[in-house]
């Protein structure tokens, strides 16, 4: 096929973008009228709707670092081979970067490969790390620890992940990639042979009772030769394809963490641009994995965050309140006293590493980034690994793409089996291999885990002739409340310690109240019979946004779900002891808008 000029791609993109919105609007007018006339006479909504469809070469679910890197790499490969390919990226956030949350210190190794002239193009990597500190905290004291290779950030940058993602989106759109924010991918579509056909976006304007409102819009079916799942940690559709294709049958159980972050404005006297601080120890006990970070970047701003491994055992533990307590430590509070908190967010992290990675490909699609689990937990970094996984996937997917005009029967999806081999031959595999034994060693507790990590990383250099196993699923680690002691947390003072509601306000949430619940209980009574009676309702503590609340109703306890508070961290989907809670996508553009987070 002859090479297509960039201008042609741009014209095609300009035409297709309004087309998708136009088809959606027209469908709304026609289908809504039919459904209201029929009044849904005993017919489920999904059976009443005839959805419109559009076909692309590639559909990518999620406009994060991995999804956008895959799109850019695919367009680069197409240009190098004189081809034009169509790529659609759907993003559930209100804009690219709206739901992107990380510490974040980025290693530019993958960006150097993807866009070598990123500095000239104005990438928002402007705050180089100038100093690393690693602390071990007791309740009153802080001890400086040696900066091990994992915590050496020379050559790295303190960034806002949201800003990086928005910049990547600009680069992708300039190459002809179509990005549609505000469209939540709600369903995986399959060919008759079981291979992935694409995705369907969610219906919008459905009331809490499941009936259409005046603003009803049906979802769209987006078909593709290859569908790339780049939803991030615990993606709802990624979870489905992993289960359907049994992609994790040869993997160890995945393990997760919950990361909570704030941004503060501090006085110039306390601001140290480029300083990166990591800490372990207090306030967590010796059986709970976790740690904290303090990053000084521009304009007197400091990012402070706290990560708790979701394999913790005590149901009374509250990651949010552990974070608030952390800021009261004498070594930490001196940075923030007199400052002002300006942003808040939370997100789950996928920590299992190499031995927990699922099979990466299946017929019709692949998993990339944190949807698969490429985070390097010992380095507390996942942006560069997500980007590299996406680039490898793009290289494996591109040769499978046929000219759609020449495809007679689009009725089966091919498998990019080469993706796994490319991964195993890359620096990404070597990095994750060297880190593989760190996280599982903490099943022995913080002290033994730390000693083992020192031996593994400093003596064996990550090449020990064995691979440790994780101790099981996170939700299975909780002990019964009767076997644990309640934890007494300090009360909010509005200075260093805050409550959940004032924190969630800073996440800039948007949520249409009149929509079906996106936090689905398989059995509502289980939340009382098991969670409340046996585990003291841990969901009221592990949720960092105050979504779950026990209230009295007619003298009996009842779980109240405040869905509008949800920051889309997915912790409930991971940690609920009976796996009774399923997180699904709410309407597109719902959730936080993290902006400069």
Question: Residue spans of the language-model regions?
Answer:
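Active-site-proximal substrate-binding core of FAD-dependent oxidoreductases
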Residues: 377-379, 395-443, 592
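N-terminal FAD cofactor-binding segment of flavoenzymes
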Residues: 92-139
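FAD-binding beta-loop-beta segment adjacent to the flavin cofactor pocket
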Residues: 347-373, 377, 504-514, 527-542
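Beta1/beta-strand and adjacent pyrophosphate-binding region of the FAD-binding site
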Residues: 52-66, 88
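Short beta-strand to alpha-helix junction loop
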Residues: 151-170, 313-317
